[in-house]
Curated annotation (Swiss-Prot):
One of the primary rRNA binding proteins, this protein initially binds near the 5'-end of the 23S rRNA. It is important during the early stages of 50S assembly. It makes multiple contacts with different domains of the 23S rRNA in the assembled 50S subunit and ribosome. This is Large ribosomal subunit protein uL4. One of its GO terms (biological process) is translation. PANTHER family: 50S RIBOSOMAL PROTEIN L4, LARGE RIBOSOMAL SUBUNIT PROTEIN UL4M. Gene3D superfamilies: 3.40.1370.10. The keyword Ribonucleoprotein applies. Belongs to the universal ribosomal protein uL4 family. Keywords: Ribonucleoprotein, Ribosomal protein, RNA-binding, rRNA-binding. The keyword RNA-binding applies. Part of the 50S ribosomal subunit. One of its GO terms (molecular function) is rRNA binding. It comes from Methylobacterium nodulans (strain LMG 21967 / CNCM I-2342 / ORS 2060). GO terms for cellular component: ribonucleoprotein complex; ribosome.
Length: 206
């Protein structure tokens, strides 16, 4: 499908033919949900931990004799039912990551790109370069493009001045094309791709 290209200043810069197999699919929410869940689970630290009966600092002596007191039978005070006792079936340090087939991840990325194109939330620019790393100048450019909450995907390397200027803008993320992912695409209102990023994505899914 034909798509207009613009410059950072909002001027017309021609057009590009987008591959329907990447940008023209009917988005599937189930694939997007699976991929986002996989990404967030993989990112989770999993450092939660509580102490078991073998780990807490408490005596293992029997609280009182077995018979004759009229009270219930108990062993050590480290049992979970007592104040200061251990935790039963508590969290342990573990990885929350789970597997997701590579083909499913690739398909989910294409559906995420298609979702932005379908919602008219996709912008293609010729390049993202600045002469200096001034945030004020970049903010003016984004104002012309109507960008306040966006993910910007550059080529294999992001221009240093552009990255420095965008770093100070809230709700603006900048990634090289090899770092593009479903979660970051969906969490921002707009997706901005450079011409180099479009070419790289089409080569990747060829």
């Amino acid at each position: 499908m034909k798509f207009e290209i613009t410059t950072l200043d909002g001027a017309d810069a021609g057009s590009v033919e987008l591959d329907e197999a990447i940008f023209g699919l009917e988005p599937r929410a189930d694939l997007l949900q699976r991929c986002v869940r996989w990404q967030l689970a993989k990112r989770q630290a999993g450092t939660h931990k509580v102490k078991t009966r073998s780990e807490i600092s408490r005596t293992t002596k029997k609280m009182y004799k077995q018979k004759g007191t009229g009270n219930a039978r108990h062993g050590a005070a480290s049992a979970p039912q007592f104040r200061g006792g251990a935790r039963a079936f508590g969290p342990v340090v573990r990885s929350h990551a789970h597997d997701l087939p590579k083909k499913v991840r690739a398909l989910a990325l294409r559906h995420a790109l298609s979702a932005k194109a379908k919602d008219a939330s996709l912008i293609v620019v010729d390049d993202v370069r600045l002469e200096d790393g001034k945030t004020k100048a970049l903010k003016e450019c984004f104002g012309k493009l109507g960008l306040s909450n966006a993910l910007i995907i550059g080529g294999t390397e992001v221009d240093e001045n552009f990255g420095r200027a965008a770093r100070n803008l809230p709700s603006i993320d900048v990634l090289p094309v090899q770092g593009i992912n479903v979660y970051d695409i969906l969490r921002r209102d707009k997706l901005v791709l450079t011409r180099a990023a479009v070419d790289a994505l089409e080569a990747r899914f060829k």
